[in-house]
UniProtKB/Swiss-Prot annotation:
Originating species: Erwinia tasmaniensis (strain DSM 17950 / CFBP 7177 / CIP 109463 / NCPPB 4357 / Et1/99)
Keywords: Lyase, Magnesium, Manganese, Metal-binding, Riboflavin biosynthesis
UniProt: Mg(2+) 1 binding residues: 38
Protein name: 3,4-dihydroxy-2-butanone 4-phosphate synthase
Gene Ontology terms describing biological process: riboflavin biosynthetic process
Sample GO molecular function, one term: magnesium ion binding
Superkingdom per UniProt: Bacteria
Residues holding D-ribulose 5-phosphate: 37-38, 42, 150-154, 174
Cofactor(s) the protein needs: Mg(2+); Mn(2+)
Record family assignment: Belongs to the DHBP synthase family.
Function field: Catalyzes the conversion of D-ribulose 5-phosphate to formate and 3,4-dihydroxy-2-butanone 4-phosphate.
Length: 218
């Protein structure tokens, strides 16, 4: 990642700290991956604090594929199988079957309905019967170990929301340009400025976690 593009958002460590602080304050964060990977920016939010207004923003400016990042334990609690048994996608993105809240939604498409589905899925006492399948929310399985295991937006989302003190459940959606093309770093930075979001890279988060976990182990 071209670090000069991100200099206004601080050093790599500061960018992670700012992202954690933003999530704690109920704001969203823009997460960039490597230019040699997907080269995309995702809007991410803590699932516990996401508002209808933030969901509407996500749908309006994103790809439309609103994903709920969860760990293996939660997926087992909800009895959500993987979408396919043989995952041949380029980066092994862990899609499960899609979901809809069993109660409290209409078509499931609106910002309110999608947020209702997310809240049903992350409730402490959530059961498989609380969700219908298929639906309009796309759960993603995060790998154990987070970004130190897999450098994806899914793992970055769960790492950031847990570092911020929330349960391991985060919402992500890829940012798109007005013409429907994928937003890359320059467009992500403009969007972040407009919507008061910090920008952090997955590389930043990997370095942050390694440095702290090395200190804790010493």
């Amino acid at each position: 990642m071209n670090q000069s593009l991100l200099s206004e958002f601080g050093t790599p460590e500061q960018r992670v700290t700012h992202a954690i602080e933003a999530l704690r304050a109920g704001r969203g964060v823009m997460v960039l991956d490597d230019e040699d990977r997907e080269n995309e920016g995702d809007m991410i939010f803590a699932a516990e604090t996401m508002t209808v207004e933030q969901m509407a923003l996500t749908i309006r400016h994103g790809s439309g594929i609103v994903c709920l990042c969860l760990n293996e334990e939660r997926l087992e609690q909800l009895d959500l199988p993987m979408m396919v048994q043989n995952n041949t996608s380029a980066y092994g993105t862990g899609f499960t079957v899609t979901i809809e809240a069993a109660e409290g939604v209409t078509t499931g498409v609106s910002a309110t309905d999608r947020l209702t589905t997310i809240r049903a899925a992350i409730a402490d006492d959530a059961r498989p019967s609380d969700l219908n399948r298929p639906g309009h929310v796309f759960p993603l399985r995060a790998r154990s170990g987070g970004v130190l295991t897999r450098g994806g937006h899914t793992e970055a989302t769960l790492d950031l929301v847990t570092l911020a003190g929330f349960k391991p459940a985060g919402v992500l959606c890829e940012l798109t340009n007005d013409d429907g093309s994928m937003a890359h770093a320059p467009e992500v930075i403009v969007f972040a400025r407009q919507h008061d979001m910090p920008v952090v890279t997955i590389e930043d988060l990997v370095s942050y976690r390694r440095s702290r976990e090395t200190l804790q182990a010493s």
